[in-house]
């Protein structure tokens, strides 16, 4: 088990970790970064890409978010477009907006 897997196991617990253990390492790096975004704050796909050391991989970050098997636990709803637009969400944009509002994020529609 490598460092990223150990950190994800620590953050998610065994049951949730088992749901993601076979995904690509890139996805796991993205998801670990998402777990560090504080509730009530948002970041961009580009920011996440830069944080994981792949500054040109914003689209690949979006793909990792789309494949997130634990979309509320691993908070991909906290990632938005650089333009400030909400962007997509596997559970639907309405759900993403509701989650962000619940966390205190001001949403411009």
Question: Residue spans of the language-model regions?
Answer:
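Structural motif
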Residues: 69-73, 86
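Regulatory, non-catalytic segments
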Residues: 56-70
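Short Lys/Arg-enriched helix C-cap and helix-to-coil transition segments
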Residues: 72-80
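…primarily DNA-binding HTH/wHTH and HhH modules…
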Residues: 85-109
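Basic nucleic-acid-binding alpha-helical/helix-turn surface characteristic of O6-alkylguanine DNA
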Residues: 1-56, 102-109
């Amino acid at each position: 088990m490598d460092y990223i897997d150990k950190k994800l196991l620590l953050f998610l617990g065994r049951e949730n970790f088992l749901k993601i253990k076979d995904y690509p390492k890139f996805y796991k790096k993205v998801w670990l970064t998402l777990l560090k975004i504080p509730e009530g704050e948002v970041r961009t796909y580009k920011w996440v890409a830069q944080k994981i050391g792949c500054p040109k991989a914003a689209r690949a970050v979006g793909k990792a978010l789309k494949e997130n098997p634990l979309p509320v636990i691993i908070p991909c709803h906290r990632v938005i477009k650089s333009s400030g637009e909400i962007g997509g969400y596997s559970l639907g944009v309405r759900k993403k907006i509701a989650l962000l509002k619940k966390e205190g994020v001001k949403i411009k529609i």
